[in-house]
Every structure is written in C-alpha cells, then in structure tokens.
C-alpha cells in the first residue's frame, strides 16, 4: 500500500508514474498493487505469480521510458529478511534495471512495519547487507508508542527516514519531519 500512496503523491505533484509488480512471490501482492494502480489512476506492469521479478522490473523500466514517465516505482518481495533467495533477487533486479537506465535505481526505499519492533531492526540489517538502501518509510505509526523504531533504525544504519505511514488512507503517508515527530512525543 505504501507504493500506491507514493504513486498518488507523485501524481498529485504532476508526475507521470508507472508501477511495477515485481513481488511475484507473495500471494495477492500483484492483485493488491493493481487495485492501488486503478485507485490512483496510474499504469502498472505485471506478470503472473512466480514470474522472474527482474523481468518485471526490466519491463517496467522499458514501459516507463516508452511512456515518457517521470517515475517508475517497483514493488519487490523480500520483506521477510530470512528469505535469502529473495534478498539475492534484489541484486539481480538492480543489475537488470541498469540495462535500461544505467544509473538505476535512483532510490531504494525500504518499507518497514513500525509495529514489528526488533524484527524491523533485523530486516533493516539484512536489506542493507543485500542492497544500498537510500531511505526508509516506516508504516503503522498511528501512535507515538512505536516511534522509537524510527529513530533507532535511522541512527543505527545511517539511513534517513523519508516517509511515515500513519493510517490506511491514501493520504496517510506523510513526509517525515523529525522536529514534528519529536514534538509529537511531548504533545
């Protein structure tokens, strides 16, 4: 859902967005992203479940270039840090993307569930070992009780938090402002 919310934000800013459903391992991941693409009104590139995720990423970038899209957002599997082959897939996806856009990806956003506590730390650790994570989005921060995860992970891995998810609505993905976030602990 984070990707759908990002697509909505970028589209509101006037950008042409293409989504890529490269999480071909998780049941219903492709369908979920298609629902978001329809809701937001952006195109989506997908293949059947079990397809090669790198192939989906490649097709997504080829389509984005052909459509003169400003932004391609590719959803990948691997949220479960213990799936080593999924982590290796990220390296392959990057390599294949660079065949279309030599300096791709321009950003690697790791989406973490803020309600998972220590598991989020382990997930961040595994992802930073597998790929160059440039920023974080931390979801399920509807209350400040889970806020320590944001600060701890960003500090430990020296990765800036770019977005926080504070609800299920399409506008509930917010740009992270550290001073506002800290103030929310005291107000």
Residue spans of the language-model regions?
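P-loop/Walker A NTP-binding module and the surrounding RecA-like catalytic core of P-loop NTPases
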Residues: 1-187
């Amino acid at each position: 859902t984070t990707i759908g919310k990002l697509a909505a934000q970028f589209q509101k800013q006037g950008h042409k967005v293409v989504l890529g459903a490269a999480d071909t391992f998780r049941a219903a991941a492709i369908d979920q992203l298609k629902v978001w693409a329809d809701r937001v009104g952006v195109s989506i590139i997908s293949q059947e479940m079990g397809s090669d995720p790198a192939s989906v990423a490649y097709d997504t970038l080829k389509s984005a270039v052909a459509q003169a899209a400003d932004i391609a957002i590719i959803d990948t599997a691997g949220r479960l840090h213990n799936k080593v082959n999924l982590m290796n897939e990220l390296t392959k996806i990057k390599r294949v993307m660079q065949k279309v856009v030599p300096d791709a990806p321009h950003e690697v956003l790791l989406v973490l569930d803020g309600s998972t506590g220590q598991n989020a730390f382990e997930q961040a650790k595994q992802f930073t070992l597998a790929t160059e994570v440039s920023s974080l989005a931390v979801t399920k921060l509807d209350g400040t009780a889970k806020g320590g995860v944001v600060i701890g992970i960003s500090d430990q891995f020296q990765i800036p938090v770019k977005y926080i998810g504070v609800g299920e609505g399409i506008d509930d993905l917010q740009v992270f402002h550290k001073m506002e976030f800290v103030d929310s602990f005291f107000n």
